[in-house]
Amino acid sequence: MKLQKPKGTQDILPGEAAKWQYLENVARETFKKYHYGEIRTPMFEHYEVISRSVGDTTDIVTKEMYDFHDKGDRHITLRPEGTAPVVRSFVENKLFAPEVQKPVKLYYIGSMFRYERPQAGRLREFHQIGVECFGSANPASDVETIAMASHLFETLGIKDMTLHLNSLGNPSSRAAYRQALIDYLTPMREQLSKDSQRRLDENPLRVLDSKEVEDKVAVENAPSILDYLDEESKAHFEAVQEMLTTLNIPFVIDTNMVRGLDYYNHTIFEFMAKVEGSDLTICAGGRYDGLVSYFDGPETPGFGFGLGLERLLLILEKQGITLPIEEPMDVYLAVLGEAANSKALALVQAIRKQGFTAERDYLGRKIKAQFKSADSFNAKTIITLGESEVETGKVIIKNNQTREEMEVSLEEITSNFATIMEKLV
């Protein structure tokens, strides 16, 4: 057997990892402005944590989950999404307690796992950034969270974005619409795809977001959920639209958008980005006021979203957005001869401890090859250290752009390298 990474996974090498780190840091800094704190949950959960919350009939549970029985015969699943584990943690750690300041605002960054056909921007191990806000039923919380996502994408420079918005209403509105949709679709059952015929029995709202051509034709004149919202649900959705307008965040109402998870109610949304003529979902989420009680916690409103890092990187690449990740090295130390080996190590370490980035040669190469390395690292300065420099205690440091040179003592470098850099760079 050839030892390679499993299908649907990837190795993220240093040059690429720098892009990931940049995106993660921008997300962290953005979320911090909104008073969100990071939460880290296990990569695997008890099967029921996901099946109970996401929905037994969803594609995630029926087709896509990586689940197994461990050596203690516990039914375990690798997490396929981030919200359910965070809600489980919220309840288990009693973050609903009165002494905990509300709303509780949490974000996570980590790996998720789904068994599906690998394609660009969608792998079997994928990485997700998500946020969850617990404790506020105020439509302003919906809008703030959507605005935070918009803020993040604006910071990254993403272009041609559209916010798609819909409401699933409260449970009674949703139940009334569910029945209306069943009544509408049942006469044309045989015209639906096999998956949607199953969905019609289990979760008819999912037929609305099917990508199959025959299903799209069938739902073209389907009743709109907005016609089945009760007064409470209408008021909530109208308030969300009004506040988005106040914040100058444009949106379109998309009544066929239902989201793939069963726990949503009231506001749901997706941000779409135009890429090579196609609309790609960049981020999606919504309100889930009943989910905490599914985990035997008290009735607690919630709102959140998730976005895939692979998908985000793909969109940035396709839109020609270059991330500012290339940071030049402060100094490269060229080493000549065995006599300078130990001193070079001490010198480069002293430079690093003063807060500068530094590298040295470890391969005993000729000076020309070492200078090429300095260029490839985009080093600002080069120090050459050989036997004579060790004996005299002095070296030449050169600005690698202007070629200006300075003679400095090794003592100056180890005690006050910042002053040298100020003079030379």
From Swiss-Prot:
The identity of this protein, by name, is Histidine--tRNA ligase
Organism (species): Streptococcus uberis (strain ATCC BAA-854 / 0140J)
Alphabetic keyword roster: Aminoacyl-tRNA synthetase, ATP-binding, Cytoplasm, Ligase, Nucleotide-binding, Protein biosynthesis
Query: Mind telling me which CDD domains this protein's record contains?
Result: HisRS-like_core (cd00773), HisRS_anticodon (cd00859)
HAMAP family in the record = His_tRNA_synth (MF_00127)
Which InterPro entries does its entry note?
Answer: aa-tRNA-synth_II, aa-tRNA-synth_II/BPL/LPL, Anticodon-bd, Anticodon-bd_dom_sf, His-tRNA-ligase, HisRS-like_core, HisRS/HisZ, HisRS_anticodon
* EC code: 6.1.1.21
Query: Which GO molecular function, any one, fits this protein according to its record?
Result: histidine-tRNA ligase activity
Give me the reactions it catalyses. Answer: tRNA(His) + L-histidine + ATP = L-histidyl-tRNA(His) + AMP + diphosphate + H(+)
Where found in the cell?
Answer: Cytoplasm
Q: Which family does it belong to?
A: Belongs to the class-II aminoacyl-tRNA synthetase family.
GO CC annotations, alphabetized: cytoplasm
Q: Which domain of life is it from?
A: Bacteria
Tell me how this protein assembles. Homodimer.
Gene Ontology biological process: histidyl-tRNA aminoacylation
- Where exactly are the transmembrane stretches of this chain? none
